[in-house]
Regions:
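Active-site loop of short-chain dehydrogenase/reductase
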Residues: 16, 64, 91-92, 139-153, ...
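The beta1-alpha1 cofactor-binding region of Rossmann-like NAD(H)/NADP(H)-dependent oxidoreductases
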Residues: 49-50, 69-80, 114
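Substrate-binding pocket helix/loop in short-chain dehydrogenase/reductase
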Residues: 106-109, 113-118
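SDR active-site lid
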Residues: 187-271
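Catalytic loop of short-chain dehydrogenase/reductase
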Residues: 149-173, 178-179, 183-187, 200-203, ...
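A short, exposed helix-loop element centered on a Lys and neighboring polar residues
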Residues: 132-133, 179
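Canonical Rossmann dinucleotide-binding motif of NAD(H)/NADP(H)-dependent dehydrogenases/reductases
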Residues: 10-42
C-alpha cells in the first residue's frame, strides 16, 4: 500500500456524527467536549450509568449530545448502541473506540491471574474488535468518508512496559490491529480510514487507575495477588513523585483532544505529540532486533 493510496480528503467535523466509548470520563470526556465544540453531534457510550448521565447533562449546553450505557465487551450491548446511533442520527462518521482498563494485576508477569488477562483484554482488545465488527460494516454500507480511532498507549503500543505486562500487551494488540484495519480500508477502496491514538503530555487525570470499580464479579482475582490497589489521580501523582523525586507533568486533556481532532480532520494515521523520543526508542529497538538481542522497553515510573 503506497502513501498516495492511504491519502484521503480532509474531513469536515462540523455536522458529523461521532461515537465515543469510555466517553464519560478522562480522555473520552475531553474528546466529547472538543467534538461538540467543533459542531459534531456526539453519542457518549460508557458502562457507568451515573457518570454517563452526569456527563451528558454537563455537556448538553455545548451541542447535540446523548448517551447510551454500553458494555463494550458485550456484542448485544454494542449492537444496541449502534442501533441507537442510527435511529437518532442515521449514520456514524467518527468512531472513537476509547474505553480501556488496566489489568489490576500488577506484579510480575507470572503473578498475573487468568482473570486479569480476561478483564484487561476483554475491554481493551475484544471491546475494540466488537466495536469494529458492529459499526464498520454499517459505516462502509453508508459509503460516507469517516474515521475509526483506536486509543492505544505508548505503554505497549510503542514498546513493552515490564511492570505492566498485561496492559502493555493489550495495547500492543490495539496498535497492531489499527495498522491492519488501515491497510484493509485502503485495499478495499473504502472511504473510511483508521487512526491509532497515543495519549501523551504527562500523567492523565482519568479513571484508568481506578477501573477496578467496574470489574465484573465473575472476573475478580482469585488470590490476594500483588497488584496495585485502585488509586485516585492524586495518589498516582504522589506515587510517581516519590519514585522520581520530582513533581510529574500533568497532561492537558482538553488541549490533547483538540490536537487529536486536528489529526482526525487531516486523516492522520498516528495521533500523538512528541514523537521524537518515540522514534529514537523505536530505532534502538530495531537495532537490537537486528542483532538478535532483547529490545529496550518503555520505562515509566509506576
Amino acid at each position: 500500500v503506497t502513501a498516495d493510496a492511504v491519502d484521503a480528503p480532509p474531513l469536515e467535523l462540523a455536522g458529523s456524527v461521532a461515537v465515543v466509548t469510555g466517553g464519560a470520563s478522562g480522555i473520552g470526556r475531553a474528546l466529547c467536549a472538543a467534538l461538540l465544540g467543533r459542531g459534531a453531534a456526539v453519542v457518549i457510550a460508557d458502562v457507568e450509568l451515573t457518570a454517563l448521565e452526569a456527563t451528558v447533562a454537563e455537556l448538553s449546553a455545548l451541542g447535540d449530545v446523548s448517551g447510551v450505557r454500553t458494555d463494550v465487551t458485550d456484542e448485544v450491548s454494542t449492537a444496541t448502541l449502534a442501533d441507537a446511533v442510527w435511529a437518532r442520527h442515521g449514520r456514524c462518521d467518527l468512531l472513537f473506540l476509547n474505553a480501556g482498563v488496566t489489568s489490576g494485576g500488577g506484579g510480575l508477569p507470572w503473578q498475573q491471574e487468568p482473570n486479569d488477562w480476561r478483564w484487561c483484554f476483554g475491554v481493551n482488545v475484544v471491546g475494540v474488535g466488537i466495536g469494529v465488527s458492529t459499526f464498520v460494516p454499517r459505516m462502509l454500507a453508508d459509503g460516507r468518508p469517516g474515521q475509526v480511532v483506536l486509543t492505544s498507549s505508548r505503554d505497549g503500543g510503542i514498546a513493552p512496559v515490564p511492570q505492566a505486562s498485561v496492559y502493555a500487551a493489550s495495547k500492543a494488540a490495539v496498535s497492531c490491529f489499527a495498522e491492519s484495519l488501515q491497510h484493509n480500508f485502503v485495499r478495499e477502496g473504502a472511504a473510511l480510514r483508521a487512526s491509532v491514538f497515543y495519549p501523551s503530555g504527562g500523567l492523565m487525570d482519568t479513571g484508568l487507575y481506578s477501573a477496578a470499580r467496574n470489574r465484573p464479579a465473575e472476573l475478580a482475582r482469585v488470590g490476594e495477588g500483588t497488584g496495585r490497589a485502585s488509586m485516585t489521580f492524586e495518589e498516582l501523582k504522589a506515587r510517581v513523585a516519590a519514585a522520581t523525586g520530582r513533581e510529574p507533568a500533568v497532561a492537558d486533556l482538553a488541549a490533547m483532544a483538540e490536537r487529536v481532532l486536528d489529526g482526525v480532520a487531516r486523516r492522520d494515521f498516528i495521533l500523538a505529540d512528541g514523537l521524537d523520543g518515540t522514534a529514537e526508542l523505536l530505532h534502538r529497538r530495531a537495532d537490537a532486533v537486528g542483532r538478535g538481542e532483547l529490545p529496550p522497553p518503555h520505562v515509566v515510573a509506576l
